[in-house]
Amino acid sequence: MIHINSLCAQTINIWLLFLAFYPFSCNFAANDISMRILIVNTSEKTGGAAVAANRLKDALNNSGVKAKMLVRDKLTDDITVVSLGHEWRNQWHLLWERFCVFWNLHFSRNHLFEIDLANTGTDITKLREFKEADIIHLSWINQGMLSLNSIKKILCSGKPVVWTMHDLWPASGICHYAHGCYRYENGCGNCPLLPGRGSSNDLSSKVWKRKKAVYHHGNMWFVTCSQWLARQAKRSGLLRGISVRSIPNPIDTHIFEPQDKQKARQQLQLPEYKRLILFVSQRVTDQRKGMDYFIDAIDKMVAEHPEMKDNTGIAILGGHAEELEGKLALPVYPIGYVTDQQRIRDVYNAANVFVLPSLEDNLPNTIMEAMACGVPCVGFKVGGIPEMIDHCKNGYVAAERNADDLAKGIHWVLDESDYTALSEAAVGKVQRCYSQRSVAMQYLEVYNEALAYKNFRL
């Protein structure tokens, strides 16, 4: 792979400036609807990365770009989403990859879904959608969707590759989040996720080296969803000399917008006259989402303000919500797992405050959705969360892993803040920073740069 160093970047900028003023039409101009983008993601709908990839596809199509999405798990009849097909083969890839992880964990379920090997996957280079695309845009491609060999074939095809990082996996050996480990900077090894903390030449080291070899086979542009993840990624020896920039995920502000709170509660059969604290997660028992800190914060808040037992409740959106009943000091209203966007919007609009005490996170879609609906958010000062929540302006940023400060923030939003000002500021920030057009224009700059570099190389 030919890395993009500063000299090359300057050359590309000159080339782009020349094209901007040269009086002829080229096939990668920002306003040229012939640009074709293929976004590759494991699932169409399941998980935050799938939601973000779908929203980016819609944002690009609404901006005049022809964008399609290639997925393993197709769940709708959307004609802009294409399935890999061969369902039995795809399931085999998933099962084999999971078995290999399980084997290397000595058949322990600890960290089973915190590790990916990319040792099996599908060759997509023969698909018509791949051949038609000007740019291949990788999103979250783990759990048997693409192998490292698949990625190598994509790079060897000569097509420019843009890769949106929803976590650290593309820049590390095998982990999605480093949990304070920085061994990924220089080759991994002695991985804390492996039994006995691995060895100097363990699985994490071997996969890191394989990635290093694969990444040399073509040109890639990495995009992170948060500035925090960009800083983490730039530390990796895998991405040394490769372009890494930060562009947030988009959101459709015509769907996620403020609605009448009482009407939303009626539709969801939630109490109309209680203050509602909302907690959302695909799997609410996921330790990374900080449920233990949430439970502790609620206990502390209710102990200090016992009147909240009568006027406040907790709505929980996500799987396994029923497991939390009896563990919280306030009444719990499980909503379950919901995929319909309008119903999710109603859930946010029913809430008075949204709490996400994640211990490590990128740029959570859930905070963006809540803010778009005018709901102030409370979260820890971790990952990309402080980039979204402006402390005491549109929400509250609590000290990391501090249940007392989390409790203080929730109570402040509910009882001490200028709630209307917080709500309006939350909506305003989303419209300024995360609208479809704003994000699409930033990605068009990356696509144009990638295509200009390809043409310059020719």
Residue ranges, per PLM feature:
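A short, active-site helix/loop in glycosyltransferases that binds the activated sugar's phosphate group
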Residues: 172-176, 198-246, 251-255, 261
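Conserved donor-binding/catalytic core segment of Leloir-type glycosyltransferases
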Residues: 271-289, 295-298
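Nucleotide-activated donor-binding/catalytic signature segment of Leloir-type glycosyltransferases, i.e.
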Residues: 305-312, 318-345
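Short alpha-helical donor nucleotide-sugar binding micro-motif in glycosyltransferases
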Residues: 346-351
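Aromatic "clamp/platform" in nucleotide-sugar-dependent glycosyltransferases that forms part
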Residues: 359
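Short hydrophobic beta-strand element within catalytic cores of glycosyltransferases
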Residues: 376-379
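Conserved acidic donor-binding segment of nucleotide-sugar-dependent glycosyltransferases
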Residues: 391-392, 396-403, 412-417
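A short, well-ordered alpha-helix in the C-terminal region of glycosyltransferases
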Residues: 405, 418-433, 439-445, 449
